[in-house]
Amino acid sequence: MNSELSAPASVNTCRLLSLDGGGAKGFHTLGVLKEIEAMCGCPLYQTFDLIFGTSTGAIIAALLALGSSVDDIHTLYKEHVPVVMRQRTASGKSRALAHLAKTVFGNRKFADLKTGVGMQQAV
């Protein structure tokens, strides 16, 4: 038996990046993504066919799929996460996040995405 595996003539692949949630833990995710982006040598939306995220990971996924660099997202997080996390109530955090979403995403549409994106809200 030949131990060398040969790839089929036509290979259907889907390169998936999955990002977890966890509020301010998004900074850890961004640190890992910075290394992946450096290893790939190109924006992550060019590397992955689908970027999927939960909670803060969904925010990062959407921004990556729109073409933002990891550095740009990290800057955004440094500026805005403390404001959101300072809110003492869930409704206060929700209001702060809604305001941030309007500021960051504005009138962007799904047609603006440069790669596939999936999002899941944590319950």
Name each model-derived stretch.
Residues 19-20, 120:
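Short hydrophobic segments within beta-strands
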